Curated annotation (Swiss-Prot):
Species name: Danio rerio
A molecular function (GO) term: metal ion binding
Gene name for this UniProt entry: aspa
A Pfam family of this chain: AstE_AspA_hybrid
Known cofactor(s): Zn(2+)
Lineage of producing organism: Eukaryota, Metazoa, Chordata, Craniata, Vertebrata
Annotated binding of Zn(2+), by residue: H23, E26, H118
Ranges that cross the membrane: none
Protein name, UniProt field: Aspartoacylase
Binding site for substrate: R65, N72, R73, Y166, S167, T168, T169, R170, E180, Y290
Location relative to the cell: Cytoplasm; Nucleus
Length: 315
């Protein structure tokens, strides 16, 4: 079979949105989106509509994660089809509005690409989040971004877990991409984190412009971390946390956690070891926003995904 046979011809990406403020205290995306709303020169690309947008303005105004419920979990079929006559939480109302503007989710008229900009208090560095292992466009794009960012690291988190995958703000698009850059405290703007996010978006938009101009991207492989399990803190019978992330694990996102390694440190000084059968790679370690979600960290496994060559489909 010739290499030409393996080229996947994909539709041009004509409409791109950049979402900031899905969580109203994650400042890098908020500032970038507002900056580009005022002056979009930096994100303009020939033949491409690129719309910066603040998704949760009330939460941004109050510098809080959300008002009533997490917007980044609100894009379920039930919420998007809820009657306007119902007394809906603010973020559910907002999800319906965003779906009308940038969707409909799963529809042919949805935006081609949505970049949803997030910060984490965890030591994750620059991370791209994907929701599908078969989206050739996104796989080729993150491969391009990772090469452009070198020698700086840009990790790729893949969440296809049937129980742990959630209905994200970006899932409205045909090609949803999350950006998670940290560590950065909530409500704080750090220049290095801000510039990393800005650089990732530049490379992403460059890729889309090249693709739309007919550039063919050869087959590639992408190293990803696949979400496996959510780990909670140890708790007592009343549900109260009884231990902290162990100092040997703290700030060690993406590093191997082996059986027998320290995982938690109880308040009375006892070390709790990891007892899993296989080595895992934790991330979102001690994320501040996830205490309410009963999550100390997420375990992942390493995987290599292969993507066919792609080019724009010519009419």
């Amino acid at each position: 079979m010739s290499s030409r046979t393996n080229i996947s011809c994909l539709q041009e990406a004509k409409r791109v949105a950049i979402f900031g403020g899905t969580h109203g205290n994650e400042m890098s995306g908020i500032v970038l989106a507002n900056m580009w709303i005022q002056n979009a020169t930096e994100i303009e690309r020939k033949g491409l509509v690129c719309k910066p947008f603040i998704t949760n303005p009330r939460a941004v105004e109050k510098c809080t994660r959300y008002i009533d419920t997490d917007l980044n979990r609100a894009f379920t079929p039930e919420n998007l089809s809820a009657s306007e006559l119902e007394a809906l939480p603010y973020e559910v109302q907002r999800a319906k509005e965003i779906n009308q503007m940038f969707g409909p989710k799963g529809g042919s008229d949805a935006y081609d690409v949505i970049f949803d900009l997030h910060n984490t208090t965890s030591n994750m560095g620059s991370t791209l989040i994907l929701e599908s292992s078969t989206d050739l466009f996104n796989l080729q794009m993150v491969h391009y971004i990772k090469k452009a960012m070198a020698p700086h690291t840009c990790s790729v988190l893949l969440n296809e877990h049937p129980q742990l995958k959630y209905s994200t703000t970006r899932s409205v698009a045909k090609h949803p991409v999350g950006l998670e850059v940290g560590p950065q405290p909530q409500g704080v703007l750090r220049s290095n984190v801000f510039e990393s996010m800005r650089t990732i978006l530049k490379h992403a938009l460059d890729f889309i412009e090249l693709f739309n101009n007919g550039v063919e991207f050869p087959p590639c492989t992408v190293n990803v971390f696949r979400v496996q399990e959510r780990m909670d803190y140890p708790r007592d019978t009343n549900g109260n946390i009884t231990a902290m992330v162990h100092p040997h694990l703290q700030d060690c996102d993406w590093e191997p956690l082996n059986r027998g390694d320290p995982m938690f440190l109880t308040f009375d000084g006892r070390t709790i070891l990891y007892e899993g059968a296989n080595t895992v790679y934790p991330t979102f370690i001690n994320e501040a926003a996830y205490y309410e979600k009963q999550q100390a960290f997420v375990t992942t496994c390493r995987e290599i995904l292969a993507a066919n060559a792609i080019r724009k489909a010519f009419k």
